[in-house]
């Protein structure tokens, strides 16, 4: 899947509102808590246990969420530079090989959780646009993971 120039421009234009505030920490945390609520078996893969409500105060998870949001922002900023975009995400995917049993099949549900978190933060979020953007970003990362 490829994005049009208009889609790239729209993603870049909307990113500041999506990431506004605390650098994405709350958005990332919300993404993970939604993900774990819907996919409780994934808590073990990420090294967590217990109730998802308790994770809202977990500094490790907060930091991981903030890093993911930062990386999405980096990817969005590189969307119009295909080779840089692909190289950055391919490398990130390869790095994820060292984090345990991470599989490409985990990313669609994580994307759903991210879109829900974004939608609760940004009034009028273009979910179709962001679903396409996430798909392109995650596909590039998965290519690195599976290489």
From Swiss-Prot:
Source organism of the structure: Glycera dibranchiata (Bloodworm)
Endpoints of the signal sequence: none
Top-rank lineage group of the source organism: Eukaryota
Protein's recorded name: Globin, polymeric component P3
GO molecular function: heme binding; metal ion binding; oxygen binding; oxygen carrier activity
UniProt cross-references to Pfam families, sorted A to Z: Globin (PF00042)
Stated family: Belongs to the globin family.
Entry-linked InterPro entries: Globin, Globin-like_OT, Globin-like_sf, Globin/Proto, Mb-like_M
Key words, A-Z: Heme, Iron, Metal-binding, Oxygen transport, Transport
UniProt key word NAD: no
CDD domains xref list: Mb-like
Tagged with keyword Nucleotidyltransferase: no
Residue ranges annotated for the Globin domain, each copy included: 2-146
Subunit details: Polymer.
Further comment found in the protein's record: This protein is one of at least six components in the polymeric fraction of Glycera hemoglobin.
Binding site for heme b: 96
């Amino acid at each position: 899947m490829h994005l049009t120039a208009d889609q790239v421009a729209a993603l870049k234009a909307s990113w500041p509102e999506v990431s506004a505030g605390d650098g994405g920490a709350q958005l990332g945390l919300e993404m993970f808590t939604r993900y774990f609520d819907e996919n409780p078996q994934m808590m073990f893969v990420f090294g967590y246990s217990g109730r998802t409500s308790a994770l809202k105060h977990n500094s490790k998870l907060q930091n991981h969420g903030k890093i993911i949001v930062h990386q999405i922002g980096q990817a969005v900023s590189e969307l119009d530079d295909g080779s840089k975009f692909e190289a950055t995400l391919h490398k990130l995917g390869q790095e994820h090989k060292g984090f345990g049993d991470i599989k490409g099949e985990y990313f669609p549900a994580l994307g759903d959780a991210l879109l829900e978190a974004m939608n609760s933060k940004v009034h009028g979020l273009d979910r179709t646009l962001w679903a396409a953007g996430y798909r392109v970003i995650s596909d590039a990362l998965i290519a690195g993971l599976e290489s």
